[in-house]
């Protein structure tokens, strides 16, 4: 078996791409949170992603997309913002450009469309959206992260 130290030594001179640099901190954070939860007995981890992010596949598998429960999973981004305002959270926390906090770009910069446009396409309200953007959004919705993980057939 190869040790973690050997693997890291072999990759020392590797140029890590932006996707790796963006996703790895989220995965390490989640592994750390689950480690802390294990040390604290019955602790559970909350996945705080929302429906817009899930629909666009804009989350890190085994990172911010993981958790034991997901209280915001059925809310679009605008509904999460309104919930925060209704709960009295600081406005600067609730009303800001969505960002992964790691790439230096907004979600809209990375996706090429807004969450409002995503919601409109999903709900069929596309009158004000250019056809090429509608197609881009529909294709994004159909990508692999939106699919249910398949189970292997059991033979025997």
Task: Tell where the protein language model's regions lie, with residue ranges.
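Active-site glycine-rich loop that binds ribose-phosphate moieties when present
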Residues: 26-29
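ATP/NTP-dependent adenylation/nucleotidyl-transfer catalytic domains that generate, transfer
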Residues: 1-4, 9-24, 34, 38-44, ...
């Amino acid at each position: 078996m190869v040790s973690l130290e050997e693997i890291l030594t072999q990759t020392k001179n590797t140029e890590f791409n932006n996707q790796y640099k963006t996703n790895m901190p989220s995965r390490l954070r989640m592994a750390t949170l689950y480690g802390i939860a294990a040390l604290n007995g019955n602790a559970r981890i909350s996945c705080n992603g929302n429906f817009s992010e899930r629909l666009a596949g804009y989350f890190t598998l085994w990172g911010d997309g993981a958790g034991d429960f997901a209280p915001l999973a059925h809310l679009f981004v605008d509904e999460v913002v309104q919930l925060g305002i209704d709960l009295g959270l600081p406005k600067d926390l609730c009303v800001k450009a969505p960002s992964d906090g790691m790439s230096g770009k907004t979600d809209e910069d990375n996706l090429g469309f807004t969450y409002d446009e995503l919601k409109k396409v999903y709900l069929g309200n596309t009158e004000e959206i250019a056809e090429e953007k509608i197609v881009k959004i529909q294709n994004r919705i159909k990508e692999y992260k939106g699919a249910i993980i398949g189970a292997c057939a059991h033979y025997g």
